[in-house]
Amino acid sequence: MFHTIRPMLPDDLAAVLRVQAACYPPPMQEAPDVVSMRLRAAPATCVVGCDGDGVCGYLFAYPSRLGRVTALDAPFAPAPDADTLYLHDLAVDPRALGRGLARSLVAHLLGPGQRPALAHAALVAVQDSARFWGGFGFAAHATDDPGLAGYPPGAVYMARLNC
Ligand SMILES: CC(C)(COP(=O)(O)OP(=O)(O)OC[C@H]1O[C@@H](n2cnc3c(N)ncnc32)[C@H](O)[C@@H]1OP(=O)(O)O)[C@@H](O)C(=O)NCCC(=O)NCCS
């Protein structure tokens, strides 16, 4: 199916929150003001995927440090000495699943020549998505960040080398 990927804009937030609501159980829903602050903190690394009916997927990311976890519902704190693109939240609306949109969103930020050019990428895999992320070269990685404890059981911190 045809879809486009573009930078996320403030006007997209209502649709982004609808996708979040469709993709996560209540304990994992993040507050609208936190989501909005994240876009303001890292506009260069937050993107949406759109189909003919509008926004149907998104990816929030920001420059961080390897080993650091963003707690659920916490604002982004971009690192001045970043070495890692932290992918905080990737979600695709049920209407658009299985059509390569998640792959396109990830490739948009991690594909060759993309900026910022950081040595690593990392994330917390939730909802049985570790195998999905493994397909992009991510593997379980040690972290002692206390933010991981706030995630549901089964969440896995994963990282990869970007090159
Ligand atoms: C995980 C998610 C983003 C995948 O979206 P999608 O648009 O259906 O994924 P794509 O169509 O781009 O699939 C890309 C590849 O991953 C595979 N894949 C998709 N979901 C998968 C999963 N849960 N486990 C393993 N592989 C998966 C696809 O088969 C495809 O493989 P292929 O290219 O070899 O055919 C989507 O299921 C989702 O939004 N889930 C709810 C939110 C969530 O839990 N996000 C993870 C946050 S860490």
Spans of model-derived segments:
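C-terminal "cap" of GNAT-fold acetyltransferases
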Residues: 9, 79, 126-127, 136, ...
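A short beta-loop-alpha structural element at the N-terminal edge
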Residues: 2-16
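Conserved acyl-donor/pantetheine-binding loop and adjacent beta-alpha core of acyl/acetyltransferases
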Residues: 58-91, 97, 144-154
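Conserved GNAT acetyl-CoA-binding A-motif
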Residues: 106, 111-126
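Active-site rim helix/loop that mediates acceptor-substrate recognition in acyltransferases
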Residues: 25-52, 56, 60-76
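Helix-loop element at the rim of GNAT/NAT acetyltransferase active sites that forms part
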Residues: 7, 18-31
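Conserved acetyl-CoA-binding loop-helix of GNAT-fold acetyltransferases
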Residues: 92, 98-111
